[in-house]
Amino acid sequence: MQKEQRKFTEKTRRDLESGCNVTIVAFGDSITAGYAVRRGFPYFWKEALALKYPEARVEMINAGISGDTTMDGQSRLDWAVLSYEPDLVTINFGINDSVLGLGLEEFEMNFVDMVRRIRAGPGSEILLMSSQPLETPPYDRLVLDYYQAVRRVATQMNVGFVDVYFAWMEKVREGTPLGSLILPGLDHPNEAGYRIIAEELMKLF
């Protein structure tokens, strides 16, 4: 799966390998912003990229805002993402949309709109992302429908998809307790959980 997804980061990888300046915008909600932690996945991802590509200069812009939905993402896409003319954009929404009851069809349309607008810009590569499992089973089942919708959009629009949910569940199947990756009572990743997200992203680099 990761090998197949690497084609969506080909240009960015080439620039990193050449020691160029690379701008990445991590766009999303509190999972991207990093809720109640000092270091979220953009921090660990940038750290890993710097180790692998020491000659490159990576500007990692964290454009996550807690509580945001895809509708909020649409409204701030121009100034939060496109204004930076990024080489690569990650888009990560879904949990808040599911909790607020936004219909799946509208949710998918919002993602399609954001992808189209980014494509009309400076030629950024695009990775869509699911988020982590939730500890409460009914909410986890609900949000999984939204994660699957993100995957559908990625396939439809021919952009990358990073399956964070699957990566976490692999760790759980290997014996890591889900609760050890989540902030107590908050259903948000702790730093150990964020490291898994960064590791999954690095499989494309």
Regions found by a protein language model. Give the residues of each.
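Serine-esterase "nucleophile elbow" of acetyl-processing enzymes
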Residues: M1-S66, M71, R76-E85
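Alpha-helical cap/lid subdomain in secreted, periplasmic
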Residues: K7, E47-A56, M71-F205
